[in-house]
């Protein structure tokens, strides 16, 4: 293997192949810190040609590889494999083309999500998908995991905004699918590739559709005595025929965390806060806000706070988007879940999650995209306590099974990764799993592209992490 | 030949696929070129495979059998104040849901929120091994497994036979308003399309009409807002607000392809606004060819009169590097630029190892 690594180093010169233990440590985990695994090496390409050469090398040598952007996967999607390399794409950060007439951007995989909207802003355009990690996550990772965000009900997920993909497949074949047009001819290859969790190869160049920025927003924050009341308000908004850009709920524990973390202010005495946002032309928002405000007022909130200006709107979103990391301050460790249930069963799902949490003796904070039934229960635990991680994972598993029973999904936007490996077969039967494995084999006959994600891999599983993140142990990062 | 060729349930569809060595599922055949396949391929009709399986208005989703006419679905949705935002084509002509997915055809309304691919959530389909498989989900958000439902959009039934489809739907807008704007030629029209597409107006549909002189611009939303926005648009370009009747005529004509030559080839071309003028020039040289530019300049429908050799159109589209598929009439199936990467064959082999469905070249 040392000989192979030597040849690998020639593909990424100037010290861009990392092999020393202290260098590898930084890549052992992603945002699912409960898992870690040390790879053989980290290759840091600077051009897409180098990425192609690396993948072709891996194919030739039967060497497993894991592509990595910013490592923000919440399902362990970029967890390294111990017998393979990590291809770190953070230096592929060029926006190759931004065309305000066609309203597209052509980007390399390492471009950070919000940088696309920043580049498009002078043209009053933006890139719609906005995962909570948008400030650091990359478009390549968004494509691999079909990332979502708070605006999926109206605008869809990442896949709905991908027009073209140039990719290197695990066989080394370079393909170009789709293009600058919003319409496609033939099967939707970009749709198939998006969300394939790195199993179908590495996107080298991605064509994104840009949308005009909405002219006007109306964002309302409403506090409720109970989660159920907030849920009822969501049902009333949905039944009204309005199509909000976002419908989000945070529960008491999540609120407590956001208050502590970003000094968010919420109406006192609330068990739940609902955030609803309308967007559109100023004329349309002026007409629709009257209806929305009446619906919210009728839903008996403790208090209702429409954002009076852009600053207040941003403050509302800052509290919401910081919720995950904020909850991290309440507890040494936590697991974020990502199940989906039919919207009308949200209340029932939350009640049962609460019951299960009490039975297990674990605290669960809930932040969720109420508009599309996407739950994000955050299970808090202390990894230093014996058995705590196992209890949390068992609870997480019960929540996923609940989502399947209710006719939903085990993952709305985080992907299966390593975290939900055991549960994909609960959603799909043996023949359906076989069909997906046949597809995988068509793309990757050797099974070298991100092995052990989405489908279990024979051989050594990743080590599980207890307590602090490896970087915290090494004193590189801290949570204050 | 084994019977029946008209399965009425997903299980019967699977059985029918298994009992034919070569087979293709067809709906109402509103896009007849797509099922013009070699004679040894048995055509399975989905006309009995119809009906809405589930419709939960509060979930913004429905599930229907593949042979369900889209018109039936549109009516059921309208009763609950909802709609399919991609404006399905050949609605009144009887197009089925499955056919719409396999053909990957979206109408003018796809401009606002996207096309078929953006609203499909899940499928049950029969693969080449005759297995009835469920892929995707029934909830509006799901990323578990590979997104085969999206892949099957535009797949022409060559990778599997659709049994059932789940879609996302939206609440219907309170009101609509159509403007007909003057555009003297392709370049002027392209400028109107791109400027309107990037504007604050949030147009629902934005099409360069087959008359070659006007742009149809449709707004949707609260009625008071539409009036204000339309005044601003008419201050920018000359044109007029159409009466509801006139508007319906225009959009129905486009949706049902009544503007096209009867019996001639009808070709869908993926384009961008900057090639509109070049495409117009290329097709103008083919006598009496008609052209409808839809979706803000992202798709072109080219209608050839029966006397024009289709190869001439194929040559021009290839010259422009534009991919295209023939939906009706006698022209090559893939009528434009085309790449066939090795992976396409490998995926066909994975889903249909015995070549039970027609080849992607047929």
Give residue spans per PLM region.
Chain B
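Conserved glycine-rich FAD pyrophosphate-binding loop
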Residues: 37-40, 47, 240-362
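Glycine-rich beta-strand-to-loop/alpha-helix junction loops that act as flexible
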Residues: 24-31
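Short cationic amphipathic helices and targeting signals
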Residues: 3-6, 62-64, 177-182, 212-225, ...
């Amino acid at each position: 293997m040392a000989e192979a690594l030597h040849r690998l180093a020639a593909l990424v010169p100037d010290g861009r192949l990392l092999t020393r233990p202290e260098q590898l440590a930084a890549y052992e985990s992603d945002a699912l810190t409960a898992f870690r695994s040390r790879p053989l090496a980290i290759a840091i390409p600077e051009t897409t040609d180098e990425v192609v050469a690396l993948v072709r090398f891996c194919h030739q040598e039967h060497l497993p590889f894991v592509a990595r952007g910013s490592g923000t996967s919440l399902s362990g999607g970029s967890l390294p494999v111990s017998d393979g390399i990590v291809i770190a794409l953070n230096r592929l950060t060029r926006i190759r083309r931004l065309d305000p007439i066609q309203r597209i951007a052509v980007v390399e995989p390492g471009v950070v999500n919000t940088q696309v909207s920043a580049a498009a802003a002078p043209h009053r355009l933006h890139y719609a998908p906005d995962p909570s990690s948008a400030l650091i996550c990359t478009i390549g990772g968004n494509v691999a995991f079909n990332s979502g965000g708070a605006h999926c009900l109206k605008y869809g997920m990442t896949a709905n905004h991908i027009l073209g993909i140039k990719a290197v497949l695990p066989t080394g074949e370079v393909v170009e699918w789709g293009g600058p047009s919003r319409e496609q001819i033939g099967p939707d290859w970009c749709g198939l590739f998006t969300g394939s969790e790195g199993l179908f190869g590495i996107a080298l160049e991605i064509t994104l559709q840009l949308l005009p920025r909405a002219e006007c927003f109306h964002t309302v924050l409403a506090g409720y005595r109970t989660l159920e009341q907030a849920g009822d308000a969501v049902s009333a908004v949905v039944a009204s025929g309005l199509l909000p850009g976002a419908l989000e709920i945070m529960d008491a524990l999540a609120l407590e965390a956001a208050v502590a973390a970003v000094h968010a202010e919420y109406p006192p005495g609330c068990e739940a806060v609902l955030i609803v946002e309308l967007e559109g032309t100023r004329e349309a928002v002026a007409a629709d806000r009257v209806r929305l405000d009446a619906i919210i007022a009728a839903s008996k909130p403790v208090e209702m706070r429409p954002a009076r200006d852009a600053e207040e709107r941003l403050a509302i979103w800052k509290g919401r988007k910081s919720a995950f990391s904020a909850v991290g301050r309440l507890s040494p460790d936590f697991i974020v879940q990502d199940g989906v249930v039919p919207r009308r069963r949200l209340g029932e799902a939350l009640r049962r999650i609460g019951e299960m949490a009490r039975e297990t003796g674990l605290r669960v904070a809930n932040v969720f995209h109420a508009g599309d039934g996407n739950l994000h229960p955050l299970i808090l635990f202390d990894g230093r306590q014996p058995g705590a991680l196992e209890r949390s994972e068992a609870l997480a598993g019960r929540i996923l099974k609940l989502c399947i029973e209710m006719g939903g999904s085990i993952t709305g936007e985080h992907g299966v990764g390593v975290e939900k490996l055991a549960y994909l077969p609960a959603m799909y039967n043996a023949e359906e799993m076989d069909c997906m494995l046949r597809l995988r084999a068509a793309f990757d006959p050797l099974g070298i592209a991100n092995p052990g994600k989405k489908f279990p891999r024979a051989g050594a599983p990743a080590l599980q992490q207890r307590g602090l993140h490896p970087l915290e142990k090494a004193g590189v990062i801290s949570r204050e | 030949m084994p019977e029946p060729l008209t399965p009425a349930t997903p299980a019967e569809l699977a059985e029918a696929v298994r009992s034919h060595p070569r087979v293709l599922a067809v709906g109402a055949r509103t896009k007849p070129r797509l099922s013009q396949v070699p004679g040894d391929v048995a055509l399975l009709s989905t006309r009995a495979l119809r009906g809405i399986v589930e419709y939960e208005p509060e979930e913004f989703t429905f599930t229907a059998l593949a042979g369900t006419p889209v018109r039936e679905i549109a009516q059921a949705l309208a009763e609950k104040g909802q709609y399919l935002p991609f404006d399905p084509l050949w609605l009144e002509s009887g197009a089925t849901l499955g056919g719409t997915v396999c053909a990957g055809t979206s109408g003018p309304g796809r401009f606002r929120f996207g096309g078929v691919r953006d609203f499909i959530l899940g499928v049950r389909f029969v693969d080449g091994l005759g297995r009835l498989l469920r892929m995707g989900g029934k909830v509006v958000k799901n990323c578990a497994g590979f997104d085969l439902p999206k892949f099957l959009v535009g797949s022409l039934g060559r990778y599997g036979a659709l049994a059932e489809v789940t879609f996302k739907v939206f609440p219907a807008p309170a009101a609509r308003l159509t403007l007909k704007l003057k555009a003297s030629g392709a370049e002027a029209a392209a400028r109107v399309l791109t400027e309107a597409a990037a504007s604050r107006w949030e147009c629902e549909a934005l099409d360069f009409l087959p008359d070659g002189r006007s742009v149809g611009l449709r707004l949707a939303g609260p009625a008071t807002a539409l009036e204000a926005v339309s005044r601003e648009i008419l201050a920018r370009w000359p044109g007029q607000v159409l009466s509801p009747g006139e508007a319906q005529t225009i959009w129905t004509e486009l949706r049902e392809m009544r503007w096209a030559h009867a019996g001639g080839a009808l070709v869908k071309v993926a384009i961008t606004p900057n090639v509109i003028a070049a495409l117009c020039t290329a097709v103008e040289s083919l006598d009496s060819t008609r052209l409808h530019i839809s979706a803000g300049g992202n798709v072109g429908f080219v209608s050839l009169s029966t006397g024009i050799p289709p190869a001439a159109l194929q040559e021009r589209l290839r010259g422009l590097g534009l991919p295209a598929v023939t939906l009706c009439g006698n022209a090559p199936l893939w009528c434009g630029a085309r790449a066939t990467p090795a992976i396409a064959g490998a995926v066909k082999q994975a889903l249909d190892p015995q070549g039970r469905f027609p080849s992607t070249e047929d």
